[in-house]
């Protein structure tokens, strides 16, 4: 190998509160028009996800590329917020959509590009099996 680029990092810019999600993204229009996330699966690369009553039955798969844990967790909150925007029962854009969550950012919202690349590679290699 003649050249290898240095590792780069990603960092989240701000924090958002989950209770504001429905109105900040106009999700009420989704419900008004009868849309849902039924039969939809979404891959989320973020800080992880907490189990939450609004996400009951939505979290189909969790993989931790930061700490190697096997159970769902989110030590920052951003990933859970994103998952809520996507598929939460009362506030999501695609309520009930299946979530395949890949933790690539740490408690500070920072992550190595290589972790994101590993997650994307895993998704590509397993998309048919995971149905995403």
Predicted regions and their residues:
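Short acidic, glycine-rich surface-loop motifs adjacent to enzyme active sites
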Residues: 5-9, 121-132
